[in-house]
Amino acid sequence: MEVNGTANILSSAFLAVEFVDSFLPQNPLQEPFKHAWNHMLQNYTKFQIATWGSLIVHELIYFLFCLPGFIFQFLPFMQKYKIQPDKPETWEKQWKCFKMLLFNHFCIQLPLICGTYYFTEFFSIPYDWDTMPRWPFLLAQCFGCAVIEDTWHYFLHRALHHRRIYKYIHKVHHDFTSPFGMQAEYAHPLETLILGAGFFIGTMVFCNHMILLWAWVTFRLLETIDVHSGYDIPLNPLHLIPFYAGARFHDFHHMNFVGNYGSTFTWWDRLFDTDSQFNKHYSHHKTAKSD
């Protein structure tokens, strides 16, 4: 009964989105995007698109999304939104982070990205424009990928905090007790592989077009950079996502080292009561702020 009820809710939500979409004017960017996509297909092989194209998307999106947080450190009026104002970013920390990122991106992630082509070939994932899913489907698929990745991340992340293995792997990610956006993928190579597997599980379940892979990469990077940003900015559109964790939730994990293990959502932490210390801390913070 619960499964049927959930299915009915999702079906109704999708029909509502379709209904709203029918009244929206045609996207003026659709034709230029279609032209650019077809131009890419005509001038590059599938291997080039799946490997070098995916690498370019990842690097461009990653550092583009890191840019606002990097600029915030130079803007005095943004410091009121910094969650740990007593721990500013330093050039030394950022340079250390950047060097680790370059190693992880090109020595760990690039070989994995090279496997994207063989993944799309094995599962017959299309690249063409005509079979590209419409935006309601794309959003739903990205959400499904996020649910799977968050579940994997919660349990494996929590396991990496076990006292017998923490200092060997996950401790690297906790080098910075006050996170900043660029630190999102700063991790031990083994952690990159272990937690990164959750990204690919969702892709294997939901991917039915090359564009979904790039859309999911974009959303995942946006989310992880946001929660590591160190800034709790009001009117953040990501907070419209139900059960979204956000920067303050994850910042506490870096400050406290335990609890708040979810990557995107808060439901697993609520279910297993691993957010209890955060809830007490946040209640105290709100009380102090109101006084």
UniProtKB/Swiss-Prot annotation:
A motif (Histidine box-1) lies at residues 157-161. One of its GO terms (cellular component) is endoplasmic reticulum membrane. A motif (Histidine box-2) lies at residues 170-174. Its cofactor is Fe cation. It holds the Pfam family FA_hydroxylase. GO terms for biological process: cholesterol biosynthetic process; regulation of chondrocyte differentiation; sterol biosynthetic process. Its EC number is 1.14.18.9. It is a multi-pass membrane protein. Pathway: Steroid biosynthesis; zymosterol biosynthesis; zymosterol from lanosterol: step 3/6. The chain crosses the membrane at residues 55-75, 100-120, 199-219. Keywords: Endoplasmic reticulum, Iron, Lipid biosynthesis, Lipid metabolism, Membrane, NAD, Oxidoreductase, Steroid biosynthesis, Steroid metabolism, Sterol biosynthesis, Sterol metabolism, Transmembrane, Transmembrane helix. Coiled coil: none annotated. It is found in: Endoplasmic reticulum membrane. It catalyses: 4,4-dimethyl-5alpha-cholest-7-en-3beta-ol + 6 Fe(II)-[cytochrome b5] + 3 O2 + 5 H(+) = 4alpha-carboxy-4beta-methyl-5alpha-cholest-7-ene-3beta-ol + 6 Fe(III)-[cytochrome b5] + 4 H2O. A motif (Histidine box-3) lies at residues 249-255. Residues 145-274 form the Fatty acid hydroxylase domain. One of its GO terms (molecular function) is C-4 methylsterol oxidase activity. Belongs to the sterol desaturase family. The histidine box domains may contain the active site and/or be involved in metal ion binding. This is Methylsterol monooxygenase 1. It comes from Danio rerio. The gene is msmo1.
